[in-house]
């Protein structure tokens, strides 16, 4: 399997997961929206890295890798590197909390509609921009 094939696979999985976000949102499963959006964002960024010949690390927030190699991306993506890094950092921070919570942090009670909207917008943004430049997925 080549980097391009693996990257295409990542984007296909991201695109398929995007279809589930509205269902979770409609059911007010806002914590689930956050968690899924993070996984979509991460998978899409790792696809972006693979498309440019970079083997992505195994950790969840690859924002710093995006920053380091932004000169390898199309201008539209390079210009958005700061925004991409910020979103990646936010979603990574929410990753475990949205799934597991904590003693004083119950995910189903903490996350609100506006959090879910933001996560959906962020996931949509990254999937669209990467697919536009690198994928044969429509």
Where do the model's predicted regions map?
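Terminal alpha-helical segments
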Residues: 1-138
């Amino acid at each position: 399997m080549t980097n391009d094939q693996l990257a295409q696979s990542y984007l296909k999985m991201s695109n398929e997961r995007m279809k589930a976000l509205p269902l979770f949102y409609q059911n007010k499963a806002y914590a689930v929206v956050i968690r899924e959006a993070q996984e979509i964002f991460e998978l899409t960024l790792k696809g972006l890295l693979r498309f440019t010949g970079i083997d992505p690390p195994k950790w969840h927030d690859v924002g710093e890798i995006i920053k380091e190699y932004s000169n390898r991306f199309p201008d539209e993506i390079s210009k958005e590197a700061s925004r991409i890094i910020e979103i990646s950092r936010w979603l990574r921070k929410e990753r475990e909390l949205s799934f597991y919570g904590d003693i004083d942090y119950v995910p189903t009670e903490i996350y609100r509609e506006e959090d879910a909207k933001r996560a959906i917008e962020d996931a949509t943004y990254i999937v669209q921009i990467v697919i536009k430049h690198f994928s044969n997925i429509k």
